């Protein structure tokens, strides 16, 4: 059979016309464009249909079925994530494997492991451990070891920390009602309330005090992690800060007295803050007036500053509740922190311009001068103090000081103390004497 003749006959019957080279190139390009567009998900559709979905509406309060479905699906997801974590038995097995594959020579008492043995342990440890046995993790932990090894203890602590972070994230996510990766105030309150029975250092707290303790603990999280006062905190931010570590430190039954006193979440600290509030509340109505708050600390906060506190902060019939008082205490006890400086700066910014000028500084310092006269102290020139403040802060604009200037100067706490607290100003004025008598406790203004 003559195939050549048969094919020509077939093409003739089908009406085939031989195309030029240019036509063939155009056809090829057209086919390529169509196939490529189809493969990329394109086509003759509007661009809006190609935008991936990025908003998922949360079920409304009356959509009970959708809410239940969402809760159940999240619970199943979190349970699956929890099962993917190493349990105590698996962690113990990992430790045995690491100890078994130590890499000589032994230097001191520190057990080390090289990269070859590190990979061997990773293969034997199981599927759950694979994420820890990567070259990236090894290079992160490698010290100045002449043999290119890492510390077994350091690596194991790294694994333990990672597992703890994931466990804690899952635990916090259970209280994330919206499922959006953040906790509202009520969510965090529920978390801490259910955490109290697991913290031996809080065993002595009366149940009647639980609500005040929870309020005290939650305020620290929101004061520092929610500076814009949105009413919610990212779970990621909670894990990244040290507050949760401080809170869970209360699991230690042998926690020293010094550690408890310096820990905001400890029972002694919470009772101290609440006790101060009760002592200030002379009329026992559960709220603080400006006159009652004026006795806070050493009683040397200026009237002008206290006026600003009650103008700017949330009050009820001109009086301050416990939650607002906690923000006030956190700001004054942590004046070096940006969140505390932001709180105080807002009170100092009487013109609401986002900066402090000479007028603002003079407005507050006049109250300091008046208090000095009352205590029989020698008057101090505002010009001298103003020049010292600008020299300390070194603002970008020589005529005004912004919040960012205060934070970057690392002198924000000193500047704030000079302007709002007579005792703070006196401490600054006599700093050279205090340094000379470093071993002695500084006297109050009344002692001078």
From Swiss-Prot:
MF-aspect GO terms: metal ion binding
Entries under Pfam families matching the protein: EF-hand_13
GO biological process entries: regulation of dephosphorylation
Protein residues bound to Ca(2+): 281, 283, 285, 287, 292
Boundaries of every EF-hand domain copy: 268-303, 336-371
TM ranges: none
PROSITE patterns in the record: EF_HAND_1
Keywords for this protein: Calcium, Cytoplasm, Metal-binding, Nucleus, Repeat
Xref: InterPro entries: EF-hand-dom_pair, EF-hand_13, EF_Hand_1_Ca_BS, PPP2R3C
Keyword Plastid (UniProt): no
GO cellular component entries: cytoplasm; nucleus
Keyword Phosphoprotein: no
Protein localization: Nucleus; Cytoplasm
Function (record text): Possible role in the regulation of cell death.
Descriptive protein name: Serine/threonine-protein phosphatase 2A regulatory subunit B'' subunit gamma
Species assigned in the record: Xenopus tropicalis
């Amino acid at each position: 059979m003559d195939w050549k003749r048969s094919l020509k006959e077939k093409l003739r019957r089908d009406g085939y016309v031989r195309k030029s080279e240019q036509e063939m190139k155009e056809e090829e390009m057209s086919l390529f464009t169509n196939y490529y567009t189809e493969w990329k998900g394109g086509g003759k559709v509007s661009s809006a249909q190609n935008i991936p979905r990025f908003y998922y509406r949360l079920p409304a309060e009356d959509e009970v079925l959708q809410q239940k479905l969402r809760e159940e699906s999240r619970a199943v997801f979190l349970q699956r994530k929890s099962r993917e974590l190493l349990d105590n038995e698996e962690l113990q097995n990992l430790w045995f494997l690491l100890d078994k594959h130590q890499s000589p020579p032994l230097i001191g008492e520190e057990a080390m492991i090289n990269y070859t043995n590190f990979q061997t342990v990773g293969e034997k440890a199981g599927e759950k451990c694979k994420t820890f046995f990567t070259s990236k993790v090894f290079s992160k932990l490698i010290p100045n070891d002449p043999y290119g090894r890492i510390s077994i203890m350091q690596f194991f602590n790294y694994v333990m920390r990672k597992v703890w972070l994931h466990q804690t994230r899952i635990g916090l996510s259970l209280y994330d009602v919206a499922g959006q990766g953040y906790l509202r105030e009520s969510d965090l309150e529920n978390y801490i309330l259910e955490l109290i029975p697991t913290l031996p250092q809080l065993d002595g707290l009366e149940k009647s005090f639980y609500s005040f303790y929870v309020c005290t603990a939650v305020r620290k999280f929101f004061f520092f992690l929610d500076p814009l006062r949105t009413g919610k905190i990212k779970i990621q931010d909670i894990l990244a800060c040290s507050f949760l570590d401080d809170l869970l430190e209360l699991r230690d039954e042998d926690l020293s007295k010094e550690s408890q006193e310096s820990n905001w979440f400890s029972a002694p600290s919470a009772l101290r803050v609440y006790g101060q509030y009760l002592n200030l509340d002379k009329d026992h109505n559960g709220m603080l007036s400006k006159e009652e708050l004026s006795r806070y600390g050493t009683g040397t906060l200026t009237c002008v500053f206290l006026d600003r506190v009650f103008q700017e902060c949330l009050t009820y019939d001109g009086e301050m509740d416990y939650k607002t008082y906690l923000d006030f205490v956190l700001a004054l006890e942590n004046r070096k922190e940006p969140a505390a400086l932001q709180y105080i700066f807002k009170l100092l910014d009487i013109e609401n311009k986002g900066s402090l000028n000479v007028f603002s500084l003079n407005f507050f310092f006049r109250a300091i001068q008046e208090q000095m006269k009352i205590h029989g102290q020698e008057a101090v020139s505002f010009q001298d103090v103003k020049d010292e403040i600008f020299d300390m802060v070194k603002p970008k604009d020589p005529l005004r000081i912004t919040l960012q200037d205060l934070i970057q100067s690392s002198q924000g706490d000193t500047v704030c103390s000079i302007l709002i607290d007579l005792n703070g100003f006196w401490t600054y004025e006599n700093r050279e004497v205090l340094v000379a008598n470093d071993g002695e406790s500084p006297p109050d203004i009344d002692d001078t």
